[in-house]
Amino acid sequence: MKTMKQNNKNMKLQAMIMAAALTTAVSVQAQNGKYISKVYDFRPAPGQFVNEIPEWEEGDTEAGMIAKAEEQISGGTDNGMISLGGFGGYVVFGFDHRVVNVSGQSDFMVYGNAVYDLVDANYASSEPGIVMVSVDANGNGLPDDEWFELAGSDYNAANTYHGYQITYEKPDPGRATAADPDADDSAIIAKTYIKWTTNSEAEPEGYVKRNSFHTTNSYWPAWISDEKMTFEGTRLECLTVNIAATGLRYVATPRAWGYVDDLPNSANKGYDIGWAVDADGNAVNLPAIDFVKVYTAVNHEHGWIGEISTEICGAEDLHPTASVTEIESDGGIKIAGCEGMVKVQGAREVSVYTLGGALAARFEGDGEAALTPALYVVRADSRVAMVQVR
């Protein structure tokens, strides 16, 4: 079910980065902040905790709700929490520095609120979110460049749907709260509350249901006036089951690794930038990233518990003192990002590009180029590397 997308954005630059077969050494520099410093976007899909976590108040705008989300999840991991609603709802955030891809290690952690089942620890309150990362390729400080999914344990699972698309329709504000109760589940007071349609032939349409535990808030983000919201991404299979002999007791089997709010934080080892893949599933070599996006990855309702909705409590850079610095290839070419410059030894011709693809410097033989602090792509003969100028 994987869709094949034509990606024509920064194709030359991406080809250079993906061709890199160099080993990155990690050095230590001044202490960076460990936790989220900025939330760039917050757009939850409809859900029972929308307008509650964080709380929407009369007059709050989109910018105001983004600021509230930032207040909840920045600066630590226990300041608060946000809910992303149903499938596709997302948040985009960053740190006060680039997060470095340290080879063979988890690079950052995103904290959720999943817990193991009190009776059977094989199950948990899993509501998985997919993680994506991006590099500020155009250098404008905004998350408007290409996104790469971190391929978790279920990326290639048989029932994973790549290119899943869902559209939610805004509910009639005049509709009665308990307009359409579910005769089979007394907790559902409106089983046809918010309609959605998808591109899945197996489940082309359905509803976000209103339950009796959240009756005063709208499940539609109050600061979004659009009549429809569309999200697209990778949909994971719902692993929630009812294990009660009688009645309803919903639990889920957590995935092995790679998803937010799926395993409890104590069992989650974090996220490796080395898992990044492009839209076609090809591995991408990203020595560092600037932005992180998390979105709810399952579209499912489970009775009185409500829709599966990823919750986030914060994120942490697991090695904030790391930086992309010196690289040495098997061919003996040395490339180093230094204070205010790039240095290269052992190459005949050297070209240095910005992440936006513009030529920043060119020289022959051993040499150096004075540059402003940023990440650069360096081509030294047939060798390609991304380095950081401090």
Model-derived features: positions:
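Sec/Tat signal peptide C-region and signal peptidase I cleavage site
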Residues: V26-A30
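Bacterial N-terminal signal peptides
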Residues: A15-A25
